[in-house]
Amino acid sequence: MTRKQRRMTIIGGSLAVLALAAALVLNALRDSIVFFSTPTMVAEKHVQAGKRFRLGGLVQPGSLQRGDNLAVSFEVADGNAKLPVAYKGILPDLFREGQGVVAEGALDANGVFKADTVLAKHDETYMPKDVADALKKQGHWKDDYGGKASDGVKPAATTAQGNPQGAVR
């Protein structure tokens, strides 16, 4: 075997081993790569009780029930299916019926998703309540904040420190 053939054999073997390792890692992480599963995906996969995963969807309007000691139950829906969720803890400020939510936990034997973490989702038009209140108080609030400005006015430029240019301190 010449030096070139030996070198090509080593490179080919190394690439084969690397491809096999990548395939094994991706296979092991297959279910973890998805950020969350929807109620429809959970129903189709027939998820085993006790297996941890993230559940995402919209909080079904009218399904929120508060119990004793911070216990909360609600349904997460995706348009096709809905899944009951039980959670014990303080809900995020953005949590509301009809809003997006991602819950982390596992299904119990009765098909109820027992969440130990609940995250409220918001869209790109979200503005923290404190900021919105401050803008309203100062008289700078516009109903279209968070969306595109209807009057064609662009937002003020900011400096590297994140302060508006020309801002009075």
Swiss-Prot record:
PANTHER family in UniProt: CYTOCHROME C-TYPE BIOGENESIS PROTEIN CCME HOMOLOG, MITOCHONDRIAL
A GO CC term assigned to this protein in UniProt: plasma membrane
Family: Belongs to the CcmE/CycJ family.
Biased composition (Polar residues): 158-169
Entries under Pfam families matching the protein: CcmE (PF03100)
Ranges that cross the membrane: 8-28
Species of provenance: Bradyrhizobium diazoefficiens (strain JCM 10833 / BCRC 13528 / IAM 13628 / NBRC 14792 / USDA 110)
Record's function text: Heme chaperone required for the biogenesis of c-type cytochromes. Transiently binds heme delivered by CcmC and transfers the heme to apo-cytochromes in a process facilitated by CcmF and CcmH.
The entry's keywords: Cell inner membrane, Cell membrane, Cytochrome c-type biogenesis, Heme, Iron, Membrane, Metal-binding, Signal-anchor, Transmembrane, Transmembrane helix
Membrane topology qualifier: Single-pass type II membrane protein
Periplasmic face residues: 29-169
UniProt binding sites for heme: H122, Y126
GO biological process, one term: cytochrome complex assembly
Protein name: Cytochrome c-type biogenesis protein CcmE
Region (Disordered): 143-169
Record's subcellular location: Cell inner membrane
Cytoplasmic side: 1-7
GO molecular function: heme binding; metal ion binding
